[in-house]
């Protein structure tokens, strides 16, 4: 199990995480390799960041629960909105606050579509190819924003796609 403070406690950029490993010979060999790879990540976490992590875990969790509920609502708005757009399909994300919709049905390549949406409609997306060779045909959209802004972005995307602009 790998996790961190980024999403549950909104500590993105603090770069602090943790892992749990089973106690077996097989996992022991893998654990040793991962530890050698990751030692620079955890050995350099400064003291204030560590104390902030402790406070996040030990402190009241009410705000975390409210934040998670808000992200759940936003995720539903994003998925429903993206699935309403012509040529776009989106499965419900399960772990992060990003959606990765398939845009192949629009006839556009991912990165040119992301650029056109930014330049013409002010909607910031990232082309799937930036995440690896299998990313073509996908965009990444963050829903770490207000529902109002998310709905505005979906409206602008709909307007762009309805424009019949050549790709």
Show the residue positions of the predicted features.
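PLP-dependent class I/II
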Residues: 1-167
């Amino acid at each position: 199990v790998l996790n961190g403070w980024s999403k549950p406690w909104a500590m993105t950029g603090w770069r602090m995480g943790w892992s749990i490993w089973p106690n077996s010979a097989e996992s022991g060999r893998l654990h040793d390799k991962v530890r050698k790879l990751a030692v620079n990540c955890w050995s350099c976490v400064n003291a204030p960041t560590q104390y902030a992590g402790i406070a996040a875990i030990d402190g009241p969790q009410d705000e975390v629960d409210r934040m998670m509920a808000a992200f759940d609502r936003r995720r539903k708005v994003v998925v429903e909105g993206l699935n309403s757009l012509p040529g776009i399909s989106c499965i419900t994300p399960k772990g992060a606050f990003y959606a990765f919709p398939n845009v192949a049905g629009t006839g556009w390549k991912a990165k040119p579509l992301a650029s056109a949406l930014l330049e013409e409609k002010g909607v910031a997306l990232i082309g799937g190819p930036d995440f690896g060779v299998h990313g073509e045909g996908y965009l990444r959209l963050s829903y770490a924003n207000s529902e109002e802004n998310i709905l505005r972005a979906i409206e602008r995307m709909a307007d762009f796609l309805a424009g019949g602009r050549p790709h």
